[in-house]
Every structure is written in C-alpha cells, then in structure tokens.
Amino acid sequence: AHIRVVSHEVNRGLSAARNTGLAAARGRYVWFPDPDDRYDFTFLQSVYNSLQQHEAPVVMVGHVEEFYDAGGKVKRVQEFTFSQESAHLGKTKLRKHVLEFEKGTHYGYAWNKVYERSYLQQGGFTFTEDLPLIEDIEFNIRVFQDLPGLNVIGAPLYRYAKREAGNLTSKFVPRYYEVHRARIEMLRNQLDSWGLLDAGAKATLGALYARYILSALERNKQKESGMSGSAQKE
C-alpha cells in the first residue's frame, strides 16, 4: 500500500511521532509537515524538479507565516524567501549561508525541508525528545554539520500557521530563556567548528541573543506565567 497509518497508544509528543514515522518510512525522501499548516499544491512537484536538476540530501523551500487571532482569522502574513529563486549550494557555500538562513527563520524548522532518508539513517539522525521549542533547530544543526550539498527553492511554498491559542510558540514555556540560550550556543559552536565565527557572525548571534532575552522578559510578564512580581524581577 502507498499509505500506512502508524500511531502511538498515548501522546508522546512531536519528536517521538516524527521518529516513529521516520522508522516506518520506506520512501527515498521524508518530509515532516505540521498537521494544521498548508502548502502550495506545487510543493512536492517543485521539490522533485529541483532534485531532478541536482541531487542533494536536503531541499529547503521558502515559506509564509500566517498569524491568526484567537477567533481563527488571519491578522498578518509575512513571506520568507531566498535571494535566489532556485539553487544548489555545495558544502562550502551552504555553510556561509547558514547564519543568513537562521536570520531569515529558515534554518530552525523541519517542515520547510525535505530530507533524503538514507542520509538521515546513515548519520543516525533522529529528533531529540523532551526538548521544547528547539527540537527542529537542534536536529538541523546535526544534519547540516557535514552536509555535502543543499538545494534551495526560493518560492514560498509552505504556509506556517501561528495561532494565538494552541501553538507551542505562543504558549508560556518556563525554560524559554534557557532553551534559546542553548540555541545560540549550538549555532556558535557550529560556526566555530567551520572556522566561520568571525566578528560579523558574533555580532549577528549577539543580536539574535538580545532578541530572545527581550522575548523571554515579555513572556515572563504574561499572566499565563503565574510568576509573582519578585519572581519576574529575578
């Protein structure tokens, strides 16, 4: 059969579900779309065309972020595309673009990428469980560490839904600051291992770090945090 359904008896979270699906997969490439998102009807055809032009272990596409209010209405739309419409990047070139990908919110997601299953298997790549918010970027940093090549499709073919209610990124997460500090540290270590941690990279990482600090402070002020005034100051 072309379609098989696999499930967990109890909800073990996103990473565990992806790992189970990855273990059950038989196709050459795997994709991890979120169930409440949408994508252009040409998404898979565009990925196929890209791979026909140049094989690669990973294909990354542009995306649109749709911000929904509590009533389910779209209140804002933002596109995230690449400077090039379509391209193949070898190991050296893709490494030089990683920080640009992170700034453009491309690097940290799994749903905007299609992965060659054999490459994931050979590298032993699976998603780390019980790692809120940064499971995708942690996975991608490991996958990209020795990635020999990457195909990029500039068109925004994936539509990511960000909702005021129900989306993990909109919920209060007690360890928000700690996990994003870990995110910056992982990026720093990767760039350093590639010999790309120059002054410009440090400045960019510093700006990203400052953004996460401000975001953490804002979240601590939310009533959902349950934090007292003294706890917020700490």
Label for each model-derived stretch:
Residues 20, 46-50, 186-193:
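A generic secondary-structure signal
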Residues 25-26, 52:
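Residues immediately N-terminal to the Walker A/P-loop in ABC ATPase nucleotide-binding domains
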Residues 14, 35-153, 158-177:
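Donor-binding/catalytic cores of nucleotide-activated saccharide
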Residues 8-25, 35:
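Glycine-rich, basic loop-to-helix element that forms the pyrophosphate-binding segment
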Residues 16, 110-111, 221, 231:
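Generic N-terminal leader/processing signal
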Residues 159-234:
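C-terminal subregions of glycosyltransferases and related glycan-biosynthesis enzymes
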Residues 30:
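Short aromatic/hydrophobic "clamp" motif used to bind/position activated sugar donors
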Residues 1-7:
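Acidic donor-binding segment of Leloir-type glycosyltransferases
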